[in-house]
C-alpha cells in the first residue's frame, strides 16, 4: 500500500486524531456485538504504547434531528473501551467546545479520549455527512497535525471526520485495520492467486451490478446465489413463482449472462416455500423452475454440489452476500454449504466482504475459518467494484 501508515510516524507527546468505526449495535444501552471495537484496538494500543495521546472520533447510527440522538451516545462504547484497554477512556460527551478542548489539553502521554458521536453534528445542516469545511478544520485543530484513519466502514464516504480532517493536517495516515482491509480485498481482486472464484449473494441485482461487471473481468468464475438468482432466471424465461424479482433489471441480468463467457454460474435448484414467513410447506425444486404459489428462499442441494465443484482447487475466494434467508434454519443450508466448501480448499485465501455474509459466518460459527472478514459492507462493495474510496484517497502518500 503506497499510503503512509501509523508506523511511519513519531507519536511521542503528540495529540493524535483517530477516526475509528465504533458503529456498534446497542440494545437498551448495551452493546450486543463489540467486534468493531476489538478491531480498532491494535491501532489505539500502538498509539498509546508509543507515547501518543489518542483522540478518537466515530459515528453511531443515523442522526438527522434532535430526537434521533436518543440512545445514540458513545458513552457505552467509552465504558467498553476502557475495560478492553485497562485504562480509563476520557469521555467529555460533546463534539466541540471549551469542555472538549480542555479535556484534550489535559491529556497526558498514553491517554485516550473519545469524542461524542460525530453525527450529532448532522442535526443542524448535516455538517458531518456533508463534510462541512469549518467542522473538518475545527476537529483537525484539536490535534498536533497527525490524523490516523482506521475506519474502513466509512472509507467510501467523504465526511468531515475523515476527509475533512485529512485536508487540514500535515500527515493523514492509515491505521492497521484500514491497512489490512485494503491489502486483503484490493490485492485479492487486483493480484489474486488463481483460480480466483467470486461468490455473490443477497437479494438485489441492482446492489451488485458494478461488482458483477468488475469481477467478471477479474475472476475465473462468479457464482450467483440469494434472491438475485430469480432476476437472472426470469431474464432467461425460467418460471420463478412468487420469488423476488427486479423487473427493471431483467435486461441488465440478460446482458451480464451474455457477456460472461460462461464465467457466471447460477444455481440449478432452490429450496422453495409457500410463503416467506408463515409457510406450511418447504421443499426442494426439481430443477431451476420455482413452483406456482411458491418462492425460492435458498439454493437447493444440487446447487450446493455444483458450487462445491466450482470451488474445487480455488486459491482466492471473495464472498459477498448469503445464499438464502440464513437467519431462518430452514433456509441456511446453502450458506453453510458454500462456507464449508470455501474453507476446506487447501491453501485458499478466503475473504468475506462484510455485511450479511460476515453476520452469517459469525452466527453460524465459521468466522474463525476465514482468512479475513471485512468490517465494512458498503466500503468493501465499492472496492470489489474497483472504485476509489474517498477516505483512502485523502491519505498522505509514502
Curated annotation (Swiss-Prot):
Keyword hit for Transferase: yes
Entry's localization field: Cytoplasm
Pathway: Carbohydrate degradation; glycolysis; pyruvate from D-glyceraldehyde 3-phosphate: step 2/5
Chain sites annotated for binding ATP: 208, 296, 327, 354-357
GO biological process: gluconeogenesis; glycolytic process
Residues noted as binding substrate in the record, renumbered to the chain: 21-23, 36, 59-62, 119, 157
Coiled-coil ranges per UniProt: none
E.C. designation(s): 2.7.2.3
Alphabetical UniProt keywords: ATP-binding, Cytoplasm, Glycolysis, Kinase, Nucleotide-binding, Transferase
Gene Ontology, cellular component aspect: cytosol
InterPro entries in the record: Phosphoglycerate_kinase, Phosphoglycerate_kinase_CS, Phosphoglycerate_kinase_N, Phosphoglycerate_kinase_sf
PROSITE patterns for the chain: PGLYCERATE_KINASE (PS00111)
A GO molecular-function descriptor: ADP binding
Catalytic activity: (2R)-3-phosphoglycerate + ATP = (2R)-3-phospho-glyceroyl phosphate + ADP
Family classification: Belongs to the phosphoglycerate kinase family.
Quaternary structure annotation from Swiss-Prot or TrEMBL: Monomer.
HAMAP family associated with the record: Phosphoglyc_kinase (MF_00145)
Name used for this protein in its record: Phosphoglycerate kinase
